[in-house]
């Protein structure tokens, strides 16, 4: 909403109530809320869909959005679009959190403005508005988060290891 975009919140859970959603998300007071189904007409209004973390990309409604040519982003892509500074990204099957934390501490010895974000529990989107060109972001990126990136292009990336469950 701050960027001038029209925001539509959608949840396929028909048991949800709009009032409950608005209470949990007071910052989305101007957003349109759709619950249950999304029509073909409503799909035509969408330019971009940002999936909440944990929403599978193979859900029928997401597949329908992809088939309609709508860009599908995750939280990482949305944050990257609005962040500044250099990004160091860590992915792989095991050791991501330890490596991300260690690299974050090393970077803090070198730079004042360091953000450790991503799958480590600190949302990238919360840190992005605070960043400057001098900032360094150390991001733990899961295999699921990699499915919903488009332009995310870290300055440095590391793939720690890959086991069959991540292929």
Residue ranges, per PLM feature:
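N-terminal leader/targeting and accessory segments in enzymes
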Residues: 1-74, 78
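Phosphate-binding loop of NTP-binding sites
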Residues: 41-44, 53-167
